[in-house]
Amino acid sequence: YYTYLICKKFNLDYFSASRAAMLHDFFLYDWHEPRKVNSFKELHAFAHPKIALQNSLKNFELNDLEKDIIVKHMWPLTIKFPKYIESYIVTFVDKYCATVEFFKYLNKRYNLKMVYRYAYIFLTVLFVRF
């Protein structure tokens, strides 16, 4: 939803960006389950964008923007830079949502209100400096 809102606000291709955002983790396996990995390129973080693209192509017709978003949403792990502004938006929204989910998990598990306060102060100082 954030991708849609941001892309719509900046008059970008919100339809393709939203569609790709919904398909970017379309890998159809439980990544929590242990599996044999022969190299670091087979680790979930590196492999799932390509698997998600393959699964998406089997089920839907995608344009170049959607393909780029799906394959490069794990940047900088994917090394290649995203080609489109919408790709960067999905990448950063994905990272933002993952961070929020992580802190919700920590808060639920450990009741870490102080962690939020220090994280807020740290991020504020970090962004104000640059």
What are these regions (language model features)?
Residues 1-130:
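Metal-dependent phosphohydrolase cores
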